[in-house]
């Protein structure tokens, strides 16, 4: 890698919710910047005013805040290379459009949409390039006086990049190696439109990356076909020596079948494709987000990092700091990565297990309050310790362990038929008497006394414990029985046993 300071950027357009593929691109830029002691820039590419969606920019910033991806400079972060919003850089772009016009590397074209459509009808596979430009209405074919007059009259025009034919354009890609494309297949791309006095993506992108001293462009594979054009633009400006290095990341693919992962795939298969819930201001449609679906941000980060990259060993669980140390663009795959949403759930489960019981309890407390439960923290911590290995999401803890906080009002019919025997009411009342006599209601003492009682009486252990579980839980699930009764306490345990006998006898 060159000696220049690493400066990378993530530059979304505020046209809607941030796709999870965009999050992965930002993550890889973040990991690369942190690993090399560089800067991560947040730029907003809002040159397409027709597609602007109110609230999208704020949504993107909030998404990264939740994920823990921090930017060093950019929109809402400040910095010395601003403004960082492209709509605020119009005068800068105009200046560089003029540089290309003055050097003969670009030209003004007046062709109307109707005229271009007519050409497409006339010539199959029509392309505005070296083979057709001299038959079109532009500053290469019209006298200068006429061009000046048309502009003075307010005639709308575009500025096109003049691409010379039959040149092999070499793009060195960190992930894909040498990519070579012949310039003859490229059209004379529009760089600027007089109608809104804004550049197109291609010009703004190159000018901004150069002026912001971006050293590496790490972006999605969908931009690979544009890379030769971008190389030619750097050369046209005389910036070839400071051109950034490119790395085009593999696509995120549908979980089933071929093609790029889309929002429709998430809707169809029941998983989010956005980091946060998104309320579309135009349609009113609400799309699910990873945060609201119960994913932990560190699990999402770890899951995404391994979609298209691997550390070279079998390690799967990695903190953000570990990812920074291990990340290597050369280990990114060229092939697309299938989006395995079940694996995402596995990561979330593993990160719940990694958290301390106190941390998980803190996340579970608001859910308990939503259900009207005011429980002491020490009880919640104990319950979480018993139950967190059974869930993939914090929100699932309620259904999994609500019996610790709310006594059953009904008893599962299937469990009742299978496990509630004819003598169960009598045995449970006996058990209640045994437990009531205990001064020490600790788990260990309960277990010792009850097991001795069962042995002394010659009762069937399974029958007693199954019936005991049904009285406390209402069904046949849950952890070790004496863990449950110890958490419930003596009074609540006795109350539940006796109530169940009343209902079930």
Curated annotation (Swiss-Prot):
A motif ('KMSKS' region) lies at residues 260-264. Keywords: Aminoacyl-tRNA synthetase, ATP-binding, Cytoplasm, Ligase, Nucleotide-binding, Protein biosynthesis. Pfam families: Anticodon_2 (PF19269), tRNA-synt_1c (PF00749). One of its GO terms (biological process) is glutamyl-tRNA aminoacylation. It is found in: Cytoplasm. It catalyses: tRNA(Glu) + L-glutamate + ATP = L-glutamyl-tRNA(Glu) + AMP + diphosphate. One of its GO terms (molecular function) is tRNA binding. A motif ('HIGH' region) lies at residues 12-22. Its EC number is 6.1.1.17. Belongs to the class-I aminoacyl-tRNA synthetase family. Glutamate--tRNA ligase type 1 subfamily. Catalyzes the attachment of glutamate to tRNA(Glu) in a two-step reaction: glutamate is first activated by ATP to form Glu-AMP and then transferred to the acceptor end of tRNA(Glu). Monomer. This is Glutamate--tRNA ligase. It comes from Phocaeicola vulgatus (strain ATCC 8482 / DSM 1447 / JCM 5826 / CCUG 4940 / NBRC 14291 / NCTC 11154) (Bacteroides vulgatus). The lineage of its organism: Bacteria, Pseudomonadati, Bacteroidota, Bacteroidia, Bacteroidales.
């Amino acid at each position: 890698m060159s000696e220049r300071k690493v400066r990378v950027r993530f530059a979304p357009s505020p046209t809607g919710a941030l796709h999870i593929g965009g999050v992965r691109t930002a993550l890889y830029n973040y990991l690369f910047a942190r690993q090399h002691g560089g800067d991560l820039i947040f730029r907003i590419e809002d040159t397409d005013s027709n597609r602007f969606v109110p609230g999208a920019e704020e949504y993107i910033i909030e998404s990264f805040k939740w994920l823990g991806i921090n930017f060093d400079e950019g929109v809402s972060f400040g910095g010395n290379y601003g403004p960082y919003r492209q709509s605020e850089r119009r005068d800068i772009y105009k200046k560089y459009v003029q540089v290309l016009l003055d050097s003969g590397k670009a030209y003004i074209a007046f062709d109307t949409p109707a005229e271009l459509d007519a050409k497409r009808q006339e010539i199959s596979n029509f392309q505005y390039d070296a083979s057709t430009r001299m038959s079109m209405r532009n500053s290469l074919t019209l006298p200068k006086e006429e061009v000046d007059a048309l502009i003075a009259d307010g005639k709308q025009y575009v500025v096109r990049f003049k691409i010379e034919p039959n040149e092999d354009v070499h793009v060195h890609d960190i992930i894909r190696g040498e990519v070579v494309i012949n310039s003859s297949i490229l059209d004379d791309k529009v760089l600027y439109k007089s109608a809104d006095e804004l550049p197109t993506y291609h010009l703004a992108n190159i000018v901004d990356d150069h002026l912001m001293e971006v050293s590496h462009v790490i972006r999605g594979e969908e931009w690979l076909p544009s890379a030769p054009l971008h190389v030619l633009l750097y050369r046209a400006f005389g910036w070839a020596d400071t051109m950034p290095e490119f790395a085009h990341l593999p696509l995120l693919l549908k979980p089933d079948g071929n093609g790029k992962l889309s929002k429709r795939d998430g809707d169809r298969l029941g998983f989010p494709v956005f980091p946060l819930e998104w309320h579309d201001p135009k349609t009113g449609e609400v799309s699910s987000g990873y945060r609201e679906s119960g994913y932990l941000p560190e699990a999402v980060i770890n899951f995404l990092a391994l979609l298209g990259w691997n550390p070279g060993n079998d390690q799967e669980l990695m903190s953000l700091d570990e990812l920074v140390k291990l990340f290597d663009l050369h280990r990114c795959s060229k092939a697309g990565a299938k989006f395995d949403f079940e694996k995402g759930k596995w990561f979330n489960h593993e990160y719940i297990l990694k958290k301390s019981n106190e941390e998980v309890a803190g996340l579970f407390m608001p859910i308990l309050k939503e259900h009207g439960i005011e429980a002491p923290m020490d009880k919640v911590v104990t319950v979480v310790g018993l139950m967190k290995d059974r869930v993939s999401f914090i929100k699932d803890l309620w259904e999994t362990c609500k019996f610790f906080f709310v006594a059953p009002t009904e008893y599962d019919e299937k469990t009742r038929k299978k496990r509630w025997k004819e003598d169960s009411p009598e045995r449970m009342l006996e058990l209640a008497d045994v437990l009531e006599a205990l001064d020490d209601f600790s788990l260990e003492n309960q277990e010792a006394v009850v097991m001795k009682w069962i042995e002394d009486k010659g009762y069937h252990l399974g029958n007693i414990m199954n019936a005991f579980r049904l009285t406390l839980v209402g069904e046949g699930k849950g952890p070790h029985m004496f863990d449950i009764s110890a958490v419930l306490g003596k009074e609540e345990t006795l109350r539940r046993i006796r109530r169940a006998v009343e209902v079930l006898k």
